[in-house]
Amino acid sequence: MSLTKTERTIIVSMWAKISTQADTIGTETLERLFLSHPQTKTYFPHFDLHPGSAQLRAHGSKVVAAVGDAVKSIDDIGGALSKLSELHAYILRVDPVNFKLLSHCLLVTLAARFPADFTAEAHAAWDKFLSVVSSVLTEKYR
């Protein structure tokens, strides 16, 4: 699945706004994930998962930074996230379905934080982009 030029433009232009709030968005996305899908907490037994904890904020920053890497390398997302894919497949052994759950939580967070920018067209573009990211992150599982 490849992104159209219009979709890429939407992703890159929204990223300029998102990146200014990256840490907050990452934290909020993870809080949403753990609240909506508590089974995902099993991958973080050593974390303080209370809302706003330092560990939650730090990991949220990493998650959004990885999305930023994908945006910056939108024409080579596979290359940008290859090491992250290997980490999650071979070392952390994260169930691939969790990437879709996380993507959904990020979409909800973006819609809540950027209601004027998150049009139906933007929603579709971000959904497709995050599907590509999820696919890249799970390709090492095969």
Swiss-Prot record:
Q: Which domain of life is it from?
A: Eukaryota
The record's GO molecular-function terms, alphabetically, read:
heme binding; iron ion binding; oxygen binding; oxygen carrier activity
Entry's InterPro entries?
A: Globin, Globin-like_sf, Globin/Proto, Hemoglobin_a-typ, Hemoglobin_oxygen_transport, Hemoglobin_zeta
Cite a GO CC annotation.
hemoglobin complex
Q: Give residues where Phosphoserine occurs.
A: 53, 73, 82
Q: Provide the alphabetized UniProt keywords.
A: Acetylation, Heme, Iron, Metal-binding, Oxygen transport, Phosphoprotein, Transport
Q: Where does the record place the Globin domain?
A: 2-142
List positions binding heme b: 59, 88
Q: Which residues carry this modification: Phosphothreonine?
A: 29
Single GO biological process annotation from the record: hydrogen peroxide catabolic process
Q: Which residues form a coiled coil?
A: none
Short name of one Pfam family:
Globin
UniProt modified residues of type N-acetylserine: 2
What is the annotated tissue distribution of the protein whose record heads this document?
Detected in fetal erythrocytes (at protein level).
For this chain, the family text in UniProt reads: Belongs to the globin family.
Q: What does this protein do?
A: The zeta chain is an alpha-type chain of mammalian embryonic hemoglobin.
What quaternary arrangement does the UniProt entry report? Heterotetramer of two zeta chains and two epsilon chains in early embryonic hemoglobin Gower-1; two zeta chains and two gamma chains in fetal hemoglobin Portland-1. Heterotetramer of two zeta chains and two beta chains in hemoglobin Portland-2, detected in fetuses and neonates with homozygous alpha-thalassemia.
Q: What is the protein name for this chain? A: Hemoglobin subunit zeta
Q: Which organism is it from?
A: Homo sapiens (Human)
Q: Which gene encodes it?
A: HBZ
